């Protein structure tokens, strides 16, 4: 028998199919099913912690990392009076309290997270700095060539806090940084960028 050829790729909701043909006789074929893909989901909110949300605040929950063929089929709230959710994943804090948001996929996989609506603003507890282009975390020391640019991106925890990030350089002659987090290496030396 020859090598396997995929006739239909597997998805999260449907098995795939592969076949191989007899290399000697040319006519005989063997077909086999390919297992469905394992359903997966990633959210831009923590599923293992309570997500704080200010009263009347809205936040867009984003879904990513779905296996081929899968999609979100429903968003539901355990208590719409406290937290409402649209069919696109936008949550809104309507009343002080807690509610669970449930996301169901076509494959049957579900994800849940708890939202706690509070009167006061959501305070930032920590933040991380990333390279906006590569989305990789920035190390404490970064080497740059003269003329090179690096754009910073700050991610706050919790994601529902709304901090205003500012950037400054200890030596603008060596490395300057603008209000959008773009660092420009000016000349050889060391400078500290503060966020």
Predicted segment positions?
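Extracytoplasmic soluble-region selector
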Residues: 15, 23, 37-195
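Extracellular modular ligand-binding repeats in secreted and cell-surface proteins
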Residues: 1-39
């Amino acid at each position: 028998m020859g090598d396997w050829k995929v006739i239909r790729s597997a998805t999260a909701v449907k098995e795939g199919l592969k076949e191989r043909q007899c290399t000697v006789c040319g006519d005989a074929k063997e077909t086999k099913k390919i297992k469905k893909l394992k359903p997966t989901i990633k959210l831009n909110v923590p599923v293992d912690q309570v997500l704080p949300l200010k009263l009347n605040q809205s936040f867009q929950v984003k879904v990513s990392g779905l296996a081929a063929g899968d999609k979100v089929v429903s968003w539901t709230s355990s208590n719409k009076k406290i937290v409402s959710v649209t069919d696109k994943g936008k949550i809104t804090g309507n009343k002080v309290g807690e509610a669970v948001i449930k996301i169901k996929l076509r494959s049957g996989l579900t994800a849940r997270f708890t939202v706690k609506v509070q009167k006061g603003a959501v305070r930032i507890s920590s933040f991380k700095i990333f390279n906006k282009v590569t989305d990789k975390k920035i190390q404490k020391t970064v080497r740059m060539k003269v003329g090179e640019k690096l754009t910073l991106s700050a991610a706050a925890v919790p994601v529902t806090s709304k901090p205003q990030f500012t950037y400054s350089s200890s030596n603008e002659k060596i490395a300057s940084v603008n209000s959008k987090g773009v660092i420009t290496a000016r000349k050889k030396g060391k400078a500290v960028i503060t966020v």
